[in-house]
Structures are given as structure tokens and as C-alpha cells.
């Protein structure tokens, strides 16, 4: 679900917490070594996310925030902010020439730039959290 979070909205805050859980506390964030990514360069959006693309030939940036039950992908378009809430059970990573995040019939492709390489440890942390989440709901082996 993509929301326009430019201005504070209590309904959006509650909706985001229902989808991906509450944010981690201060000490938990320190213990994890951070819960947010650095700025990532967006190469491409899916056709149903093209309304977020900058209209001028400018670089699109995104940040990722880890939550208890999912992630938030925050995208800046000019002076507007958009937040894409993705629960872990819908989250899929693809790695090829570029890395992309797929969920809810949408995707974002990130460029393999210097900023992406700085975020590799954080992306592995997200993947580990997703694996832990999936293990809670896996079927027992017979």
C-alpha cells in the first residue's frame, strides 16, 4: 500500500502500524545496529508506481526502514514523500544486474552503486528478519 506521507496523518500512522507493526524502540534499534538504510538510488519503478517518478530528469532516491512485521520503503518526489508499507509475507527480493523489491504487484529496482554496496549489510538484516518471520508460519516436517 502506497501512502502520501508528506504531512502527519494519524490515520496513516495507525494503518502503517497495523500492516508492518510498530517501530523498534531506541535501545532495540541500537542493539540491531540500526533499523534504517542509507539513501538508495532507484533505477526503475513498476508501471503502477510511475506516479512517484520525478517528472524532470532527476535521480529518484528511496530509504528503507525495518519494522517488526515488515518494511517501509520511503520515496521522495520533489517536496512530496511517499511510503510503501510491505509486510514480510509479501516481500520478495530479486538480485540480478540490479536488486529489486517486489510486493503487491509492484516493484522498485535499485542501482548497484556505491550507496547500494554500503547498504548490503542492512539488506541482509532484512532478509534474515523475513526468514525468521516465515519460520514462525512454516509447516512442521513429517
Q: Language-model features: where?
A:
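Acidic, Ser/Thr- and proline-rich intrinsically disordered linker/docking segments
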Residues: 1-45, 90-142
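Short, contiguous, helix-prone interaction/anchoring segments in small proteins
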Residues: 33-66
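Phosphoinositide-binding peripheral membrane targeting modules
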Residues: 55-94
Amino acid at each position: 500500500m502506497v501512502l502520501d506521507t508528506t504531512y502527519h496523518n494519524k490515520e496513516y500512522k495507525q494503518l502503517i502500524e497495523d500492516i508492518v507493526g510498530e517501530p523498534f524502540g531506541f535501545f532495540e534499534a541500537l542493539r540491531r545496529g540500526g533499523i534504517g538504510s542509507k539513501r538508495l538510488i532507484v533505477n526503475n519503478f513498476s508501471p503502477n508506481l510511475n506516479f512517484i517518478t520525478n517528472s524532470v530528469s532527476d535521480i529518484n532516491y528511496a530509504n528503507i526502514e525495518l519494522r517488526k512485521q515488515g518494511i517501509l520503503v520511503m520515496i521522495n518526489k520533489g517536496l512530496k514523500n511517499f511510503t510503501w508499507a510491505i509486510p514480510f509475507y509479501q516481500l520478495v527480493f530479486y538480485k540480478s544486474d540490479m536488486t529489486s523489491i517486489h510486493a503487491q504487484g509492484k516493484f522498485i529496482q535499485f542501482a548497484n552503486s556505491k550507496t547500494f554496496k554500503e547498504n548490503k549489510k542492512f539488506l541482509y538484516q532484512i532478509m534474515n528478519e523475513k526468514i525468521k518471520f516465515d519460520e514462525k508460519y512454516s509447516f512442521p516436517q513429517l
